[in-house]
């Protein structure tokens, strides 16, 4: 039947597809077919590693658009049926895997099962999903498992297609017993089974090791992650709060024993925390394909501006278990950060956005970041943060340099990494 549908029509579409490729200036293999001047060829040959990556990214995006046009015509659909068109939410590959994730995701740390009610959680997920977000992140430790329960219940209630979602969870702190925490084979398998039961799902898309475990051999960790993937309990695995050396060790073990390596590292990334994502992870991406999924783009709310005049009673820093955040805010370094935020405000005003939107867009301007996880406690906060998508095109090199001149914390690497 498919052959019948794609007979004459398929031939016509193929011809149109070929025309589109010619217009785009490159073939499926990525080779330039358009004539170039000698000066242009010389210019291309001198591209920096980052320039080459950006050129390749643009070529892949154009090729993906060509293929999407072909598919839509084949199915007698228009581009209006695609999520990107209807919501404007860009998607990126998770590392060098084929998994496509929305460049903004919704996290559940502190909020789900703790700071907000189940009704507010449902509103947040609905707003995110209808805005094109397909990535929802949680962990077994969040609210002692309650965050997973709430997340799973909302997905079931909404009836969203499982294939349209990317659900991730993290393992390490599962319970009080010695065998209920860590990254032993026992806890990875049992912990993930428990997460799936709470989520009411057959599998998660990515399971993360929530921190390194010095008490468990790396081979055991990698074998356990490979096992849960082979058993269909997860599609991919990644790391969180791991050092570059530890991630590289996991990759080496996986290659040595023909197992599955990690595809992503979850790392903190914001205006005041840059070293790991901007210096260490690019090396891992170019060498072994490990991408970056970042969290806390507003530095636990510090960048939101709510702490400019102290710590509000309803804020995260006012919670008993977050005294460390309160201490950070009232410290000398915290006061310096607040002053820098005041200096950044004119840039946000000039771009027609809020400071939180500027901060999230600043994270997204890094093409090495696959997705930025948002943590919002109100629908208004989430809608505001999602608005960073409209600010992203305004993040020119001039604007980024302005921000760097104010922050004065840009990390530098002596190496160039080529893919």
UniProtKB/Swiss-Prot annotation:
Residues 30-43 have a biased composition (Basic and acidic residues). It is found in: Cytoplasm; Membrane; Cell membrane. Keywords: Cell membrane, Cytoplasm, Ion transport, Membrane, NADP, Oxidoreductase, Potassium, Potassium transport, Transport. One of its GO terms (biological process) is learning or memory. GO terms for molecular function: aldo-keto reductase (NADPH) activity; carbonyl reductase (NADPH) activity; molecular function inhibitor activity; NADPH binding; potassium channel regulator activity; protein domain specific binding; transmembrane transporter binding; voltage-gated potassium channel activity. Belongs to the shaker potassium channel beta subunit family. It catalyses: a primary alcohol + NADP(+) = an aldehyde + NADPH + H(+); a secondary alcohol + NADP(+) = a ketone + NADPH + H(+). This is Voltage-gated potassium channel subunit beta-1. It comes from Homo sapiens. The active site is at residue 142. The N-terminal domain of the beta subunit mediates closure of delayed rectifier potassium channels by physically obstructing the pore. Homotetramer. Interaction with tetrameric potassium channel alpha subunits gives rise to a heterooctamer. Identified in potassium channel complexes containing KCNA1, KCNA2, KCNA4, KCNA5, KCNA6, KCNAB1 and KCNAB2. Part of a complex containing KCNA1, KCNA4 and LGI1; interaction with LGI1 inhibits down-regulation of KCNA1 channel activity. Interacts with the dimer formed by GNB1 and GNG2; this enhances KCNA1 binding. Interacts with SQSTM1. In brain, expression is most prominent in caudate nucleus, hippocampus and thalamus. Significant expression also detected in amygdala and subthalamic nucleus. Also expressed in both healthy and cardiomyopathic heart. Up to four times more abundant in left ventricle than left atrium. Its EC number is 1.1.1.-. Changing residue 307 to F: Reduces affinity for NADPH. Residues 1-52 are annotated as: Disordered. InterPro entries: K_chnl_volt-dep_bsu_KCNAB (IPR005983), K_chnl_volt-dep_bsu_KCNAB-rel (IPR005399), K_chnl_volt-dep_bsu_KCNAB1 (IPR005400), NADP_OxRdtase_dom (IPR023210), NADP_OxRdtase_dom_sf (IPR036812). Regulatory subunit of the voltage-gated potassium (Kv) Shaker channels composed of pore-forming and potassium-conducting alpha subunits and of regulatory beta subunits. The beta-1/KCNAB1 cytoplasmic subunit mediates closure of delayed rectifier potassium channels by physically obstructing the pore via its N-terminal domain and increases the speed of channel closure for other family members. Promotes the inactivation of Kv1.1/KCNA1, Kv1.2/KCNA2, Kv1.4/KCNA4, Kv1.5/KCNA5 and Kv1.6/KCNA6 alpha subunit-containing channels. Its main location: cytoplasm. NADP(+) binds at residues 108-109, 115, 137, 210, 240-241, 266, 295-300, 306, 316, 375, 377, 381, 384-385. GO terms for cellular component: cytoplasmic side of plasma membrane; cytosol; juxtaparanode region of axon; plasma membrane; potassium channel complex; voltage-gated potassium channel complex.
């Amino acid at each position: 039947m498919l052959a019948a549908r794609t007979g004459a029509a398929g031939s016509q579409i193929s011809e149109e597809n070929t025309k589109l490729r010619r217009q785009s200036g490159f073939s499926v293999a990525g080779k330039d077919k358009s004539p170039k001047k000698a000066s242009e060829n010389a210019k291309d040959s001198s591209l920096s590693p980052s320039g080459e990556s950006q050129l390749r990214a643009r070529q892949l995006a154009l090729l993906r658009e060509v293929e999407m046009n072909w598919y839509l015509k084949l199915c007698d659909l228009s581009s209006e049926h695609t999520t990107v068109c209807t919501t404007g939410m860009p998607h990126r590959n998770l590392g060098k895997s084929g998994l496509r994730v929305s460049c903004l995701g919704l996290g559940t740390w502190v909020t789900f099962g703790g700071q907000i009610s189940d009704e507010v959680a449902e509103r947040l997920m609905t707003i995110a999903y209808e805005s094109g977000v397909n990535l929802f992140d949680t962990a077994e430790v969040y609210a002692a498992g309650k965050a997973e329960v709430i997340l799973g219940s909302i997905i079931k209630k909404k009836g969203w297609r499982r294939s349209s979602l990317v659900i991730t969870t993290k393992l390490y702190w599962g319970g009080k017993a010695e065998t209920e925490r860590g990254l032993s084979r026992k806890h990875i398998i049992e912990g993930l089974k428990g997460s799936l039961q709470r989520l009411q799902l057959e599998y998660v898309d990515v399971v993360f090791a929530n921190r390194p475990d010095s008490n468990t051999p790396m081979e055991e960790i990698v074998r356990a992650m490979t096992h849960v993937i082979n058993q269909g309990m997860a599609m991919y695995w990644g790391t969180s709060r791991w050092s570059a050396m530890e991630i590289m060790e996991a990759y080496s073990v996986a290659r040595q024993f023909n197992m599955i390596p990690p595809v992503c590292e979850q790392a903190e990334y914001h205006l005041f925390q840059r070293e790991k994502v901007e210096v260490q992870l690019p090396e891992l991406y170019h060498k072994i394909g490990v991408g970056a999924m970042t969290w806390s783009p507003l530095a636990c709310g510090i960048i939101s501006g709510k702490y400019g005049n102290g710590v509000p009673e309803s804020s995260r820093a006012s919670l008993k278990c977050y005294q460390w955040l309160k201490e950070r805010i009232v410290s000398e370094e915290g006061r310096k950060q607040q002053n820098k935020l005041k200096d950044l405000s004119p840039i946000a005003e000039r771009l027609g956005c809020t400071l939180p939107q500027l901060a999230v867009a600043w994270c997204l301007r890094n093409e090495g970041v696959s997705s930025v996880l948002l943590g919002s406690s109100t629908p208004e906060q989430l809608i505001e943060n999602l608005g960073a998508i409209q600010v992203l095109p305004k993040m020119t090199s001039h604007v980024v340099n302005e921000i760097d001149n104010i922050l004065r914390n840009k990390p530098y690497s002596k190496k160039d990494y080529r893919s």
